[in-house]
């Protein structure tokens, strides 16, 4: 029962995080992350480590892109991570559509906070 409650709590954290991200409320998103979070840099490649690096990455991203991510479905993986199927739409600052696709975000939690995230093609899921 406690495990089910933990999963429900983690999914609620992720739902709030997606809503905050789409509002560009970076500080609210960062509050759901572990201090040394490991995050993918989907724009430039590689990964960023720690909240301040994630903050800097998103500031750079929001200067040139207008991403929107809408969670559609969540599942618990065998290793305990949570996979979220996400509809991702990205425009450039002039409004030109760059990306409209389904992807999957896979989260690992530690101490009730997001420890890491990876991005997968839905076909890999």
Question: How would you name each of these model-derived features?
Answer:
Residues 1-9, 55-125:
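A beta-strand edge to alpha-helix "cap/lid" segment located at domain peripheries
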Residues 1-32, 36, 113, 125:
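Short, low-complexity N-terminal intrinsically disordered segments enriched in polar/charged residues
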Residues 24-27, 40-45, 91-94:
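Short, charged low-complexity linear motifs
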Residues 38-48, 60-64, 120:
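A short gly/proline-enriched turn/hairpin at secondary-structure junctions
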């Amino acid at each position: 029962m406690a495990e089910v409650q933990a999963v429900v709590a983690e999914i609620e954290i992720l739902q709030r995080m997606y809503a905050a991200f789409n509002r560009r409320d970076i500080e609210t998103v960062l509050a759901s992350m572990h201090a040394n979070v490991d995050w993918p840099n989907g724009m430039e490649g590689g990964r960023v480590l720690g909240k301040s690096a994630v903050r800097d990455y998103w500031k750079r991203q929001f200067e040139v892109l207008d991403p929107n991510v809408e969670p559609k479905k969540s599942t618990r993986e065998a290793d305990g991570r949570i996979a979220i199927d996400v509809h991702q739409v990205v425009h450039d600052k002039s409004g030109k559509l760059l990306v409209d696709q389904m992807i999957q975000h896979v989260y690992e939690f530690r101490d009730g906070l997001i420890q890491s995230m990876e991005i997968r093609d839905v076909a890999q899921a």
